[in-house]
């Protein structure tokens, strides 16, 4: 089915689109252009939506805004925004009455005419997705990047050619209701995350598993052999399994031998590059490259991989060097919205650092983070709703002694950053690596990271 054929099938149906945000706005415009009866639903007020509300209404949309935006859903087809659970009472009631529940990404999987690689995991998704996309581009392929990053791809599907590649980053929220899988699926790692939304860890893992659950023989699934959960998932994959590992040498996949990154495929082993070729800091980025190499095996020449690794500076908000100020290096690692991500960031630095952490409570335990902070942090500056929980995890960790590390609780966010600056000495590293989501003070981790950068870059020499 093509995108146009799908849209034609909706012309005599009513459609609701929940969420007037970045991912759904192009969809709304396209539906309205096709003359489809559309209701646009959003919790935001008309004032907050601004000119977009006027534009949609002028194009023929019915707006359903505010706290009751989910009430009375009776449309034939309902597009769910990824952040909304599919089992909220209003959606369940609509489905009982005959409504079809779908999403922008689910329909894209139905109509996408080209090859598809999708990446999920708790950490490393964006960097791995970006590496895969850039490697394919460097090899001369036409690439479309979407999902959690890039552009919404559904409305671009008719412009894609069969030989193109769609490279997607998919979250557990997007995957929850998926019933199709990509040609090449990558699971970077899995650890507790988003437990404020998911019922439990089992539901979170099950959602992630949809990325490879519906593959067919001949498809490819890439897993982290060093992660307990993903190693078990590899045994349930239908497609060809490729593993990546820093600690062992899988029969099929990518692994580390000393400082060399090697690939073993169909019984043949070859050296791709060394870890020194990777410009990005941290062992977690070695893992990101190994996952990407496993995904593009046979598609990208080894020399292109090596040349790219030597020059790629990474993605914004991921251990991003913001500035050196009075001899102190400031890093923006705002993407670190889970303990495992912060741990990876801390391990990237050879010295003990000044850490700014804390934020929105996703109900993730911090017990694994405590010992890492004791080992890698000289001063801990806490800010946000989880400050008390992180402090408790550190103070209860083995090896903790009073003031080792010293712990400060400072609000608001700007003052926390300034407190880190005031305590830092030449040669120190200050890193924003919160271990939490940003929603208690910011719209998202990107706004938090940009705010941090603006504060640091605003200081006069």
Q: What are these model-predicted stretches?
A:
Residues 1-103, 107, 301:
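N-terminal leader/targeting and accessory segments in enzymes
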Residues 3-14, 24-34, 142, 274-378:
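Nucleotide phosphate-binding/pyrophosphate-handling subdomain across enzymes
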Residues 29, 70-73, 82-225, 229-240, ...:
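Phosphate-binding loop of NTP-binding sites
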Residues 31, 78, 119, 148, ...:
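Residue-level signal for inorganic ion chemistry
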Residues 37-44, 221-225, 356-357, 376-385:
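Short internal beta-strands
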Residues 39-43, 64-67, 102-106, 144, ...:
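Beta-strand->loop->alpha-helix junctions that form or flank phosphate-binding loops
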Residues 52-54, 59, 368-428:
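C-terminal helical cap/extension that packs against the catalytic core
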Residues 178-181, 211-217, 235-237, 348-350, ...:
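Short, conserved loop/helix-junction motifs that constitute active-site signature segments
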């Amino acid at each position: 089915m093509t995108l146009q054929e799908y849209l034609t099938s909706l012309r005599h149906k009513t459609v609701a689109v929940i969420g007037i945000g970045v991912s759904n706005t192009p969809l709304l415009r396209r539906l309205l252009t096709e003359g489809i009866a559309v209701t646009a639903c959003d919790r935001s007020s008309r004032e907050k939506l601004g000119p977009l509300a006027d534009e949609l209404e002028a194009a023929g949309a019915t707006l359903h805004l505010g706290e009751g935006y989910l009430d009375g859903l009776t449309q034939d087809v309902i597009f769910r925004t990824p952040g909304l659970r599919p089992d909220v009472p209003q959606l369940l009631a609509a489905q009982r009455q005959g409504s079809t529940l779908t999403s922008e990404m689910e329909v894209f999987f139905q109509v996408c005419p080209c090859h598809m690689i999708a990446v999920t995991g708790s950490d490393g998704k964006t960097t791995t997705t970006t590496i895969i996309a850039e490697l394919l581009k460097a090899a001369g392929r036409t690439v479309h990047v979407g999902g959690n990053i890039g552009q919404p791809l559904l409305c671009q599907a008719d412009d894609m050619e069969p030989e193109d590649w769609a490279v997607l980053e998919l979250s557990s929220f997007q995957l929850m209701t998926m019933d199709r899988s990509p040609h090449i699926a990558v699971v970077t790692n899995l650890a507790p995350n988003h437990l404020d939304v998911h019922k439990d860890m089992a539901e979170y893992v099950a959602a992630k598993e949809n990325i490879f659950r519906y593959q067919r023989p001949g498809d490819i699934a890439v897993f982290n052999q060093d992660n307990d959960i993903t190693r078990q998932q590899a045994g349930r994959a239908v497609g060809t399994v490729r593993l990546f590992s820093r600690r062992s040498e899988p029969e099929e996949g990518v692994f580390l031998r000393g400082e060399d990154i090697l690939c073993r495929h169909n019984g043949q082993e070859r050296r791709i590059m060394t870890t020194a070729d990777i410009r990005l800091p941290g062992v977690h980025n070695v893992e990101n490259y190994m996952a990407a190499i496993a995904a593009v095996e046979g598609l990208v020449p080894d020399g292109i991989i090596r040349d790219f690794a030597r020059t790629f500076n990474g993605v914004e908000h991921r251990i991003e060097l913001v500035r050196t100020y009075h001899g102190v290096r400031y890093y923006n690692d705002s993407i670190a919205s889970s303990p495992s991500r912060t741990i990876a960031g801390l391990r990237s630095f050879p010295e003990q650092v000044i850490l700014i952490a804390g934020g929105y409570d996703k109900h993730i335990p911090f017990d694994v983070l405590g010992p890492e902070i004791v080992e890698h942090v000289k001063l801990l500056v806490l800010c946000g709703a989880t400050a008390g929980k992180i402090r408790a995890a550190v103070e209860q960790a083995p090896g903790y002694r009073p003031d080792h590390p010293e712990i400060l609780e400072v609000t608001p966010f700007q003052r926390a950053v300034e407190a880190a600056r005031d305590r830092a000495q030449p040669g120190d590293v200050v890193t924003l690596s919160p271990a939490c989501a940003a929603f208690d003070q910011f719209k998202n981790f990107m706004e938090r990271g940009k705010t941090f950068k603006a504060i640091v870059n605003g200081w006069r020499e």
